[in-house]
Amino acid sequence: MKILIFIIASFMLIGVWCKEGYPMGRDGCKIPCALNHKFCKTECQAKWKGSDGYCYSTGMSCYCTNLPENAEVWDPNNNKCVG
């Protein structure tokens, strides 16, 4: 039973440290890319050191991983994109 609680607690901690999402430009829109992973990685690391990023081919937008909890990312429910 103790091991089960430990595993559940570990997954909860991993979720806290592994925020992901689309970074936003100044206009509140997702940052577009054309399958250029290096560009997206640079964009993600410029905003949040230690993060990683890639070009998400389905949405043609940069996607960042390993973000800090306070990182502001694009939210489809609260879309502020004016472009």
UniProtKB/Swiss-Prot annotation:
Ranges for the LCN-type CS-alpha/beta domain? 19-82
User: Could you tell me the superkingdom of the organism this chain comes from?
Assistant: Eukaryota
**Which Pfam families does the record cross-reference, listed alphabetically?**
Toxin_3 (PF00537)
User: Which Gene Ontology molecular-function terms are recorded?
Assistant: sodium channel inhibitor activity; toxin activity
Q: List the disulfide bonds.
A: C29-C81, C33-C55, C40-C62, C44-C64
- Give the signal sequence positions: 1-18
Q: Write down the InterPro entries for this protein, in alphabetical order.
A: LCN-type_CS_alpha_beta_dom, Scorpion_toxin-like, Scorpion_toxin-like_sf, Scorpion_toxinL, Scorpion_toxinL/defensin
Question: Keywords assigned by UniProt?
Answer: Disulfide bond, Ion channel impairing toxin, Neurotoxin, Secreted, Signal, Toxin, Voltage-gated sodium channel impairing toxin
- Looking at the UniProt record for this protein, which Gene Ontology cellular component terms does it annotate, in alphabetical order? extracellular region
What the protein does?
A: Beta toxins bind voltage-independently at site-4 of sodium channels (Nav) and shift the voltage of activation toward more negative potentials thereby affecting sodium channel activation and promoting spontaneous and repetitive firing.
What protein is this chain from?
Putative beta-neurotoxin RjAa10f
Q: Which organism is it from?
A: Rhopalurus junceus (Caribbean blue scorpion)
